[in-house]
Amino acid sequence: MADGGNRRNVTGEVTKPGVSSRHSLIQYEHAATETCTLMDFMGYGPHIRQARRDAYKTVDRLMTALMCGSATCFTTGSKAEGLTCFLESDIDVMCVDNNVICIEEGVDSSNILKETTILRACSQKSYPGHCILLLERSGTTITTFVHNALCDDGYDHELLSSALYINAWLNFKRTEGAVILDRVGPSTPSTYYGGTLHQDLVHALHLYCPSILTRWAARPRNWPTNNIVQKVVSLGTVVTPVGFKGSDYEHVEWRLCFNAGENVLVNNLTDIMVKVYVLLKMVKQDVLKPRKKEVTSFTVKNIVLWIAEKTPQSLLHERSLFQWLHEGLYALRVAIDTKELPYYMIPERNLMAACALEHEQKLSWIATINDMIEEGPIMILRLPKIRRALIAHPEPLRWYSGRRIEMEMLELIAMNRGALDMDEDTDVIMVAVLTRKADIMKEVRDRMITEGCRENNLHDLYHSMLL
C-alpha cells in the first residue's frame, strides 16, 4: 500500500514496507506504466485477449451444435480468458449433459420434463462445495454413462458414483489420432497431433442451486457490477466428477463448479487486474514451481477475484500495477502460511484444505515471496518471459510481437474453419491463411538468420511462435 507504513499479516509479522517517499512512488508508477506497455506487446493486451475469447466462443457454439441438444460444450480456463497463446497451455473444455438435472435439497422437481433424469444433491456429509447425488427419477432419455454409474448406497437408494462416471468416459473412444492420458481430477486429458495440442475435457452435469448463488449475489461488494452479478447467477452451476481428497465418500462425491460464471468474472476484470493475474500466474509457475499442485492457477485466480471485489475500481489503474501485485503476493503468502483461502463462489470451501504442502516448502516459499515484495518493481526480472521481453524491447519486441500475434490470429481462424470441416486445399479462406502463415515464418526466419541465429527449421519456429 502507498501509505508509508508497514503491513502485518494474520500472525502479526511485519511483512512489507509501504512506499516511503514521493520519489519512490513516481518510480513505482513509471515502472508500472512501462510494464503494462511491455505486457501488451507480449500478447496480454485487451484487443488480443478479446480476439482469443471470441475465437473459442465460436468453437464452443460449433461443438454444442454438433451435440444436437444432448450436451452443451464450452471452453474454460486460460483459453476462455484470452490469456494464453494457441499452444501455450492445455485447452480446457467442459461438456455438460443436458439430459440430467441435479437440484439442491428443498427445490421442487415436479415441473421438470419427464425426459430429464433428476438427481438430488445432498451435502450434509460432504465438505463444503461438494455433494452426493441421489437418483430421484430416471428420465426417458438417459445416457449409458449415467446409467452405468448408478450404484446402491446400502439404504435402498441409488446414487451416482463420480468414480464410475469418469472411468466410463476414460474408456470412451475419442477422435482418431487422440491419445488418452491418465485422469487428472475431474478431467479426462488427451493429446492430438503427436502431442502438440493438449486438451483437458471435463464431463459435467447441470446443478440448480439457487441458495448458493443467492448468497453469493447478496454479498456487499465494489465489483462486479449488478448486471455482471446477475449474468453470473443466470449461468448457473455444474457438478464435476471428483470428490474431496481424503473423504470417506470421495468415490461418490461431486464438486460444485461455476466455470461459465468465472469466465465472465475474469473477462470483466479491469485491465490492470488481468495483468496482476498474469504476473501472479508467472510467479506460481516460474518462481514457486509447485510439484504437487500445492498452489495452482485457480488459487491465484481466487486471490485476484477477492482483491477486485473488495477494492474501489477507481484505484485499479495502470500506475498502480505494482501496488496490486504486492497485494496479490501478500495474499498468496498468507494463504501458504495459514493454508487457508476461501473459494470466491463458496467461501466455506477452503481451497488450501487438501493442499499437500510440506513445512520446509512452505517456509521456502514464504521467504521467496517476502524477498519479491521487498524488491519492488525489479521483482519482475525473476520472471523469464518478462526478462526475455525486456531484453528485446522496444524495436525487436515490437516487430516480433506483431508477427506472433498475427500468426496466432491466423491459427485461430484456421481452428474455426477446421471446426466447420472446411478443406485446407479448397477453402479460399484456409488457403489464404496457410499462405500468410508461411510468409510470416519466412520473414521471422530471415530476420533470425540476419541477426546471427542458425536455427532455420520452420516447424520448430512455428511451434515456438505459438507457445
Q: Which residues does each PLM region occupy?
A:
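Non-catalytic helical "accessory" subdomain of NTase-fold nucleotidyltransferases
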Residues: 1-467
